[in-house]
């Protein structure tokens, strides 16, 4: 289930950063309490779901 979303908060980890307003695609669930998202550049991140807002 792929769904488009937009970040509402910044997210940082050792692989890089995602910034507020960035568009991502939700790929599905990752570990418990996290979702897997793909950025426009193709980078994959596991992030908490409360920092994204689903779009149409």
Language-model segments: which ranges?
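Basic/aromatic-rich interaction segments and small domains that mediate binding to polyanionic partners
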Residues: 2-56
């Amino acid at each position: 289930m792929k769904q488009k979303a937009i970040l509402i908060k910044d997210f940082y980890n050792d692989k890089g950063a995602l910034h507020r307003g960035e568009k991502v695609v939700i790929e599905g669930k990752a570990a418990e309490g996290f979702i897997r998202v793909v950025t426009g550049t193709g980078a994959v991140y596991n992030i908490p779901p409360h920092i994204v807002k689903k779009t149409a």
